[in-house]
Each structure stands twice: as C-alpha cells, then as structure tokens.
C-alpha cells in the first residue's frame, strides 16, 4: 500500500511546532474524530515569498516574522537543506538551487552551468548557492524541507 503523508504549515506569522509531537497529536485526533490513519506528517515553514510575503507586508507582520526566522536560525539544519543536494529545473531547462529560488527567478550562480543541457556535476557540486532572506525559512528551528523538518 502507498504511504499517506500529510503536509502542514502554520496559519499566520509563526514557525511550525515540533513535527514529531504534532504528528502524534494529528494521528490521535484524526483517528478519533474521523477514523483516518496516515503514515507521516511533514511540517513546513512558510517562506517569506510570493503571496505569503504579500500577506506579511499587508498585515504588518513582515519585520516580526523575519526577526523570528533569523533568531531561530539553526546551523545544524544547513547540511540538510534542499539546495545542498537538489536542483530545480525550470520548464525551459534553466537550473535553480531550490524551488523557492525558481519561484523568485534566481538562477544558479554564474560559475555553474545555468541550463540542463550544460549539466556538469563537478561544477554544480562546487558552486556557490544563491541565497536570500527567504533562506532563513529553511534553517529556522528544526529546519524545513520537502520532507518536513530537518533536525
């Protein structure tokens, strides 16, 4: 049977709670209330980009949220972030360090191949990673990745 994985992110300008404890709570309550079972829960941090960034600005939460992300920086998450071992490939073949950089149209660094047709693993693995303020979202607290928290 295919595993069922649920994904959640906080509503508002907050960091996600601890993934393990929230998963236990969700498993208990979804089973009790609805008879639903699932295999895993991934907690994802909201990235300060696109519509969420617009909401942060419009609601006056941008400064506080960014301060919260920066204050929660966890160096132990850096090795597990998406950009360290994954590339995003655009529809047109352009390469990005992560999905968020792709959304922001921030291609991989100039020294690396910038298109899939020029793929060169040694140059790509030794590249500098293009970063921005949104990167604090992946390194805050327990970290955040496509698979939920990192640490």
Residue ranges and their predicted role:
Residues 45, 90, 142:
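Residues that line or immediately flank small-molecule/substrate-binding pockets and catalytic motifs
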Residues 2-4, 85, 134-136:
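A generic secondary-structure signal marking the coil-to-beta-strand transition
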Residues 1-79:
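Radical SAM enzyme [4Fe-4S]-AdoMet core and its adjacent flexible, acidic
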